[in-house]
Structures are given as structure tokens and as C-alpha cells.
Amino acid sequence: MKGKFIVIEGLEGAGKSSAHQSVVRVLHELAIQDVVFTREPGGTPLAEKLRHLIKHETEEPVTHKAELLMLYAARIQLVDNVIKPALMQGKWVVGDRHDMSSQAYQGGGRQLDPHFMLTLKETVLGDFEPDLTIYLDIDPIVGLARARGRGELDRIEQMDLDFFHRTRARYLELVKDNPKAVMINAEQSIELVQADIERAVKNWWKSNEK
């Protein structure tokens, strides 16, 4: 039986790491033990090198389109070499970010051309998409305060507040239009967030159980 692909999305400081643990806990309760973890950008040797280029300052400015193309290069390496093979083996994959991140950050935050964004997505990924996307919604002010509390910010995390407001607005549009996505209020206590995530996964499981 083919596995399923669950993705966790959200702004910086939304609590994706904790959400990851909540999803895995539910899967284990459902007797799904063979779970593969991924992160974007990253997850393969080449993708991890691209991650470093994307997230850190370089000797020359990185254009918005170059940034996006590096993200897609890393993504297809991960999808073709890790995610798809795992799914075909019946394993479940839980991912920290996927394509919705690019649509929100580069499409919303960077304000790249929507037609260019859609064409690139369809060319690289085709009809491949997560079975379930869990979006952790948080006010950028709250999220960035949490992120700063963790230490030094990377190149993208250092963007101005307007960038993150645009990114969040695009996330909200994407989730609204995606029947396979659920939104969780990430400004609640960690206990309430975890409970909402576990409930969302269980409800999704029941509605898709065959």
C-alpha cells in the first residue's frame, strides 16, 4: 500500500518542530511506525548545499528568481530521490515545508509573478502534492519574536515585517483554496496547538480511511 505525505507549513516561530512531534505521535497511535522525516530546503546532499546558499549571505546578491530556482532544484531532488521512493515503499513522509512555502514566501513575500510561479511549479512537480498540509498560523510579530529568542536569524528571517505580512496573507489564501489543507492557530499554548494538530490528523485519517 502506498504511503501518505503530510506537510507542516508556517512562518518562523510557528512551532513546526513541535508540530512534527505531534503528527508522529498520532501516526504511531494509528499503528503507522515507518515514518520518514524531511525538511525543505534540504534532505539530500545536494539539497543541503542549496539550503546553505539560500539561507546564508553570499559574496553576491541572490536575485529573487535565483532564490526560487534554487528552492525548486532542492525540492525536486528531495521529491524524486527521497519522498516518492519512500511513498512507493509504503512509508509515510512527514515534511517540514514543501511547495506551499515557495508560493507564500516567494509568491507572496517576494511578490514574484503568479504566472511564473504556477508555470515553474507545474513544470517541476506536475501533479505531485501532499495528502495533508497542516498550516500553523501566527502573527509575524509573535513568530519573529519567538525566532529571535532562538538565536541568530538567517538571510530570509532577517527580512522586514511587511515581507512576513505578505507571506502570511498568501498562506491564508492558499489554505483557503486547498481542500487538503487545515489551519491551526499557532498563537495558543503549545498544549492546545498539539491537541488541535492531533485532532486534525485523526479527523483526516477517518475521512480518508479505506
From Swiss-Prot:
ATP binds at G10, L11, E12, G13, A14, G15, K16, S17. Its EC number is 2.7.4.9. Keywords: ATP-binding, Kinase, Nucleotide biosynthesis, Nucleotide-binding, Transferase. It is an enzyme of class 2 (transferase). InterPro entries: P-loop_NTPase, Thymidylate_kin-like_dom, Thymidylate_kin_CS, Thymidylate_kinase. It catalyses: dTMP + ATP = dTDP + ADP. PROSITE patterns: THYMIDYLATE_KINASE. Gene3D superfamilies: P-loop containing nucleotide triphosphate hydrolases. One of its GO terms (molecular function) is dTMP kinase activity. Phosphorylation of dTMP to form dTDP in both de novo and salvage pathways of dTTP synthesis. Belongs to the thymidylate kinase family. This is Thymidylate kinase. The lineage of its organism: Bacteria, Pseudomonadati, Pseudomonadota, Gammaproteobacteria, Pasteurellales.
